[in-house]
């Protein structure tokens, strides 16, 4: 994170006592999809997921996205993987579009008032996601993402900070935007070239998981 600023307290309870990142609950769409048998090695991963709509930097809606974070081992205290899924264009069924090590991704709180997150790869490619959930649970659900953000920010054992607030200085943001390429969340565009040796785009028809 550039600028080294302290994270601001965010709406949704980021300053509350930390709860377990993966509270037991009814599996979401992504979890149920993984339980369907397509991806046997992901069946038992603890996953925290939400439904979003992808929006442009200016708030225009692009498409629907389900995003989740998962721990690749029960021994891990915090998640180390990011999963992205979306509806199949032909039948509308959920398909897994990509799985990425969190060390290669940054997740920002882009706009708290609109419950928007920003996902950015090290290549500079980025996209914006706005939480899509019932109004009566939206604040609580976004608050869980913020609390997870804080856990990852302050409990990370490495120097990498995968989750943080997007509160860089104006001149730094201008420089960042010049390097940033806004990304559309769809299959075929979710694999930053420099990570091809260490991560794999997951074809929903194939059960190969790059060694997990």
UniProtKB/Swiss-Prot annotation:
Q: What is its main location?
A: Golgi
Report biased composition (Acidic residues) as residue ranges.
Answer: 169-185
Which biological process terms from the Gene Ontology are attached to this UniProt entry?
cell morphogenesis; defense response to virus; flagellated sperm motility; innate immune response; penetration of zona pellucida; positive regulation of type I interferon production; single fertilization; spermatid development
Among its keywords, does the record have Endoplasmic reticulum?
no
Q: Which InterPro entries match?
A: GARIL-like_Rab2B-bd (IPR022168)
Q: In which tissues is it expressed?
A: Expressed in testis (at protein level).
Q: Transmembrane stretches, by residue range?
A: none
Question: Which cellular components does GO assign to this protein?
Answer: Golgi apparatus; sperm head
Q: Which Pfam families match?
A: GARIL_Rab2_bd
Per UniProt, which keywords does this protein have?
Golgi apparatus
Query: Key word Mitochondrion present in the record?
Result: no
Q: Where is this region: Disordered?
A: 1-21, 162-212
Its annotated compartments are: Golgi apparatus
The domain of life is Eukaryota
Task: Summarize subunit and interaction data from the UniProt record for this chain.
Answer: Interacts (via N-terminus) with RAB2B (in GTP-bound form).
> What function does this protein fulfil?
RAB2B effector protein which promotes cytosolic DNA-induced innate immune responses. Regulates IFN responses against DNA viruses by regulating the CGAS-STING signaling axis.
Record-stated family = Belongs to the GARIN family.
The record's section on PANTHER family has: GOLGI-ASSOCIATED RAB2 INTERACTOR PROTEIN 5A, PTHR22574
User: What name does the UniProt record give this protein?
Assistant: Golgi-associated RAB2 interactor protein 5A
Please name the taxonomic classification of the source: Eukaryota, Metazoa, Chordata, Craniata, Vertebrata
Name of the gene: Garin5a
